[in-house]
């Protein structure tokens, strides 16, 4: 049995340009992240009769056609659009209202709208437990010898004497998919295809993020 998705979701792919601050109507500084969301286009539509669910596929970002595989080139040609570097699929109940090749602009959202932003966090490489998990480490004195940043016991001295799955240890930090939820769109600049979103977004400058309708406000 297929569960249908009965919620309208709007979404755009964009490039994170960085953070700045603007004034609100009360003259207070508001920290915002600027996202440039141009060249979004509908590349595929899905429906319950054929696919078992309703969804819209969005393409974003230019790419050299010579670098696109033949199957993907045919996929974009069927939609009547030029090849795009990034593609994302959004499940939404109103997918039938979209058209193949339709261009989507930042006017999809309005000031004050609540959104979730999905991105890839900054990669930090291999990190210890103090940086990665916020451990306190070991004391600086009182006999501590070259143990200052170590995690301490990982469970071998207790019962059962083994290390459980999920034990917080040193390892690769960052470069992971992350969703920041329930953010507010502060302003929309349709002329320059810019979204000003209050607060910080995951990822470095120049990274691609997905701005979509929030699930908490549904």
UniProtKB/Swiss-Prot annotation:
Any single Gene Ontology cellular-component annotation: cytosolic large ribosomal subunit
TM segments?
none
Q: Which domain of life is it from?
A: Bacteria
Keyword Ribonucleoprotein: yes or no?
A: yes
**What's a GO biological-process term for it?**
translation
* Positions of the UniProt region annotated as Disordered: 137-157
GO MF assignments:
rRNA binding; structural constituent of ribosome
Keywords for this protein: Ribonucleoprotein, Ribosomal protein, RNA-binding, rRNA-binding
Family membership noted in the UniProt record = Belongs to the universal ribosomal protein uL3 family.
Its assembly, as annotated, is: Part of the 50S ribosomal subunit. Forms a cluster with proteins L14 and L19.
Describe the function of this protein. One of the primary rRNA binding proteins, it binds directly near the 3'-end of the 23S rRNA, where it nucleates assembly of the 50S subunit.
Q: What HAMAP family does the database record attribute to this sequence?
A: Ribosomal_uL3_B
Q: What is this protein called?
A: Large ribosomal subunit protein uL3
Taxonomy-wise, where does this protein's organism fall, top ranks first?
Bacteria, Bacillati, Actinomycetota, Actinomycetes, Micrococcales
What is the gene name? rplC
